[in-house]
């Protein structure tokens, strides 16, 4: 998907259809002002309840000298550790009680040329306090020496996580792109020495020098009145005095490098080959610039589409294939690549280059272009629903990006007209000319090494690939796409009952036992959102099929449906802008589909074929086997993989569904086994539910349900046992000394194998317990003990499993392993015995705020509905989510905490130590 919003068509008048330097039109709903001290503010009122705030100081690591590396980032951290009106971490606690979550709603980031503070408010009740804190950030941060020393551990934890020793290919590619530039010399996080040597005085000096009103901007969107909030801004910020006036120049003119390279990959990655093409600088202020951005996006998508079809037609295994148009700092790039097993290197290099050369010399077909442009047309058609779903944080983030990149924040009407014009102008001739313009130049190729590869061995390979690219391309034998390929039901089924249900549902009981929950909703726009799912998943199949289960989804997708091959299916789905996402879980299975409402017949026909007409190609099965073997082998050779395998095999007996499948186990998998899995999952009814949300009427939906859903033949299914089988003697402690990092991965697993079955309210209780647990972990391990930047806690059990299985995860300095053990022991013990009403109230508020997205987001809502329906959790709990959350009592949470962390639980500690 393009990371921008596209708007539906307006009829153009008889004006010229040629993009030019006409300026883009600003969104007039923005009010921009400037205080006498130089601080700018940007206000965007909406009808939403929420309010989003962004406070940006256009200062970052570029302002640091050699002795100040990482100071801008360190100052950002200190804003959450005490200021004029907020002591310690009080600001985090305050906004959490209002429904915000640290990280998602309360956060900040530091870049090369800006530092931005973010607050998301549930309503206007805490707006004054939010602005008070942001005013504190401007010149009221307190640099308590003890807090500075504590925060060093947190920042070093962030440094360990974000600057790994075992660097991924993408990490190395980024640093290669800034090699020798000013970016390389100013890493925002700094270095370990600078972080450790920072003092309260040195940080305060940097802060007082650079945090100045003339460098700062405040963005407020959502539930505010322009005049009222402008007056409050003036009241809060007008007295912020300028104390320094150093020159700050926004640098958007520093190009990144696109050069032939050979780069290392991480231990879990496979070899790869890539290209990267410079497309100039960011900055979108004219129609022509916007059209060029779209042209680049189309070119990238055409490249990816062709690469995928070539690889799939050849039944070549691959780890990934991509082509994207994106921004790297202030440079626009088009990049693409493919990853593969070491044994395929020669063939994949050849296919990659030949495909690009063919595109350069012969372009694409009309069918290929139509497949890509369908996404633009769909976004255009869905203007109103997409625009209505935009929340205050969308407007705030978009404005922040536009200010940073010097873009015009475009009006809806202008965007709509310009996109309409682009679609009209982007003919096959134009698209191929643009594609040729991208590829008809010296293309820098980049090679990603595999494990054991030596840099010197492959040093000249990128140049050899470039030489091969200069040869004439080969014209494809056929570029035709198949317009029909889905098989039709021989006989329609029946609707045997229709019931109305709270929430605006029509509930259809079909003759084959499927239950369809249809919710008409204008917010869905011109899209139809569908989930078709059932209990079962891996728990439903014979243990002998577990290896085949790992391959089933990708094999089916690559093979195709009905009379479509995999490549033909991909083209057909793109052309019809239909998303089809099969899901095979541990205890459930199904498919998610999103398509145009006027093409609901096509979408449901696709569902019918997925349920009845998969067509496994033996070549694709072999390709997927090789893909799995390469991926799983690389993973299990890594330190993390070895730790996970050790923990898994020490917990679960052989031939149980949670036992990890290794690479050598998939070799014997047959087509018959894939077919058997499909028949078990989609040929038997374990309570299939279909949830459909669309702006349609029951009269439009019912005939299609009879034709395509009620016609799916289903057999009765035997009852399933979802019990989780564990080994008798679980080890309390496991360690692997194969880590690639200088840090220790610290995992604590808390397991209770005997827990009662759950209902809908239990899911709310569990979610709230996780929020409480995470808040405790962040307070104890991050803020108090300074052991890790981002410790985590999360449940791992699946729906229907009557167990409790939680993990505490952190990445720490090896010397702190014993201290972390003590801290985790304390956290777990206190969770089991002492939870407060305040914590329950805060978690309930946060959960209610997060679930509010169901009101405006049909896809988000559909996922929740489906989960609750197939698991019999009771959909009423969701329909009244705020009431359900508020009804959770302290005693209920304490009881769940005791079951989860208290007496009777088993504990396992797993450590990955450096080699």
Predicted regions and their residues:
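Proteolytic maturation boundary segments
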Residues: 15-40, 225-266, 271-280, 284-285, ...
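Active-site recognition of the HExxH zinc-binding catalytic motif
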Residues: 69-77, 81, 301, 546-554, ...
